[in-house]
């Protein structure tokens, strides 16, 4: 079935995204919307085109019953209420085995190019030998960052489709066991998805640190200057 949605301004999506913790448990999320959210994650930036991020869809009640026993206690009500949980994981084997495939393809398609110093000789004799000998803990760090980018894309797609979302944690090794992860896969975070049981207004606007406290100009600690009129567009 084709995706049925109304086009939403991207600035509006950024401004209205909230962490939603109350869902309508009686309203199922359409499969095509789940697919669109997962496609947004799939299409996010992937280092070396290695495609190391996985998303496991948890929708069946029996899986949810097992899964919700091993998430953080304060997240259990939300995980039970949400019709869907997407479980994001990184897979180190996909790094070690995927880079030798994905990076040459990226070069041939012009994603990395000679004007920046890339060549097949450089890829095969320098870049790949270096990247594919990174220790697992370094690969996990890099792929955790990559997973975050995929999750951000998924959250924005969910918001654009009129759905709520909220990331939550759990017992990684037990989650891996319940969902059948291979040893190379590592749980990063789960994301509740569903039709909101609360409005954007009731969720409120979360206060953030002042712009200049975390956004710097040229050097760490030198506050960047924000234009209030720009901020107003996002609130």
Question: Model-derived features: where do they sit?
Answer:
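Acidic, surface-exposed loops and disordered segments
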Residues: 1-235
């Amino acid at each position: 079935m084709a995706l049925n949605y109304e086009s939403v301004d991207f600035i509006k999506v950024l401004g209205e995204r909230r962490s939603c913790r109350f869902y309508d448990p009686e309203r199922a999320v359409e499969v095509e919307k789940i697919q669109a959210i997962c496609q947004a994650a799939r299409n996010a930036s992937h280092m070396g085109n290695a495609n190391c991020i996985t998303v496991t869809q948890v929708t069946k009640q029996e899986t949810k019953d097992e899964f919700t026993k091993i998430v953080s206690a304060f997240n259990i009500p939300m995980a039970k209420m949400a019709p869907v949980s997407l479980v994001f994981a990184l897979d180190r084997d996909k790094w070690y085995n995927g880079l030798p495939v994905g990076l040459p393809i990226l070069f041939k398609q012009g994603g990395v190019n000679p004007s920046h110093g890339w060549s097949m000789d450089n890829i095969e004799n320098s870049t790949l030998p270096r990247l594919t000998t990174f220790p697992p803990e370094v690969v996990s760090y890099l792929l955790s960052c990559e997973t975050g980018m995929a999750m951000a894309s998924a959250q924005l797609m969910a918001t654009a489709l009129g759905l709520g979302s909220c990331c939550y944690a759990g017992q990684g090794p037990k989650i891996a066991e319940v969902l059948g992860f291979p040893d190379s896969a590592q749980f990063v975070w789960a994301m509740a998805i569903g039709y909101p049981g609360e409005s954007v207004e009731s969720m409120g606007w979360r206060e953030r640190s002042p712009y200049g406290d975390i956004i710097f100009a040229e050097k760490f600690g030198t506050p960047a200057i924000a234009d209030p009129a720009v901020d107003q567009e996002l609130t």
